[in-house]
């Protein structure tokens, strides 16, 4: 469902932001 999609998107977003912050 949409909740599962949002959860996956949230995890991906956090990982992406983490990499951006490290740069």
Swiss-Prot record:
Keywords assigned by UniProt, alphabetized: Antibiotic, Antimicrobial, Fungicide, Secreted
Tissue expression as described in the entry: Expressed by the skin glands.
One BP term from GO: killing of cells of another organism
Taxonomy, superkingdom: Eukaryota
Primary location: secreted
Cellular localisation: Secreted
Coiled-coil portions: none
Parts of the chain that traverse the membrane: none
A GO CC term attached to the entry: extracellular region
Family per record: Belongs to the gastrin/cholecystokinin family. Magainin subfamily.
Role played: Has antimicrobial activity against Gram-negative bacterium E.coli ATCC 25922 (MIC=50 uM) and against fungus C.albicans ATCC 90028 (MIC=100 uM). Has no hemolytic activity against human erythrocytes even at high concentrations.
Name under which the protein is recorded: Magainin-B2
